[in-house]
Amino acid sequence: MTPSLYGAVKSRANEALVESLDYCKWALQSVSRSFALTIPLVEDALLAPIMVGYLEARILDTFEDDIGKRHVSLEERVRAMNAIMEILERPDSKMADRKAQELASQADEWVQDEHYRGLVKNFDKVLTVHRSLDERTKASMVKWMHEINAGMQKYLQQPVYSFEDLNEYCYFVAGTPSGFLTEL
């Protein structure tokens, strides 16, 4: 039996949430290679949080390293990354909706890869699923996203010069998801 990609979330979902879950499932296949193969195999209760956590990290990473069709300054990228964190910290606020729409409106100009651009343009759907998660899961997700964001921003502002730097950067972008998964 193949596990449901939506886990427990879909059983209590309204139409907008089901549509958003369907989008997230499609987006995962579009923007990921290895995680698109493994996330659907996780037990039902963890599927939606892991999928959404991955997509949110992918959005953050897009502003870190997909510099787009025009030069996007370091300041603009940092501002966008901080806006993502503000959205995730207060996902139910009007500010979150407004900032998600602002990021979506900048995607055509800022994001070169068409799949990542589509994900940023549909941040509202990822946010809809995020909102449906329990408070403990959201708090854990935000905590680890802060860690990822801090590391990404550090290495946006300074190159990786040594193996020690590389080790630290790898922790921020690859080790932190393990912390989130452990807390789940």
Where are these regions (language model features)?
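Acidic catalytic motifs of isoprenoid enzymes
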Residues: 1-184
